[in-house]
Amino acid sequence: YLCQIEGYEGNQAVLKIREKTEKDTELPSKIWLFQGLPKGDKMELIVQKAVELGVYGIVPFAAKRSVVRLDEKKAGKKQIRWQAIAKGAAEQSGRGLIPEVEIVKTYAEALEFAKELDVILVPYELEEGMKATMSIIEAIRPGQSVGIFIGPEGGFEEEEVRDAMEAGGKPVTLGKRILRTETAGMTMLSILMYTLESV
């Protein structure tokens, strides 16, 4: 905080906050993780690790292959729980801000939200070519906002991938192995963290 002394009360100074500044622990780009709803409590692990890796915000969404279906009441309770986990992870990892965990959205709502971002990455198990993927990632500049779309267990349906491409998404690969939903987002975030902090 940047403060100004307003006066004194006894032996204590009275300060007025002029400006809040973020710690320099933040990534040079705002990265949003769009996560297809996974089974069980996997979302809690995903939120915790994504926050530790520097994500700016998390948008859970229901994909066609999402097994979990949350009504409005359950979605609200989950969002409160996930936000508390994000707060704890941010404090533990020395973050300068607490990432926002959005309320669960439909896939269409998530794509609409992502249209405001500069770059949308869609790791897809049928995509090939690590060189093409690295070219896309290395073209991301500090200050650009980035969205990462991760499917639930079973991945995305081809129609969902097409919809993401129409919204400006770029398909990327995470290698020759098929990763679990809770691993894919962390892998992509790690690659971005390394790339952006190396510029």
Language model regions located:
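Structured adenosyl-cofactor binding patch, chiefly the S-adenosyl-L-methionine
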Residues: 158-199
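Short connector loops at helix/strand junctions that flank enzyme active sites
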Residues: 10-12, 26-30, 143-145
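Active-site/ligand-binding-proximal alpha/beta "capping" segment
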Residues: 118-155, 159-160, 169-172
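N-terminal positively charged helical leader segments and presequences
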Residues: 1-23
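Gly/Ser/Thr-rich beta-alpha loop segments that engage phosphate groups in nucleotides
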Residues: 38, 42, 149, 153-157, ...
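Short, hinge-like loop/turn segments at secondary-structure boundaries
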Residues: 75-79, 139, 190-191
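RNA substrate-binding interface of SAM-dependent RNA methyltransferases
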Residues: 18, 22-121
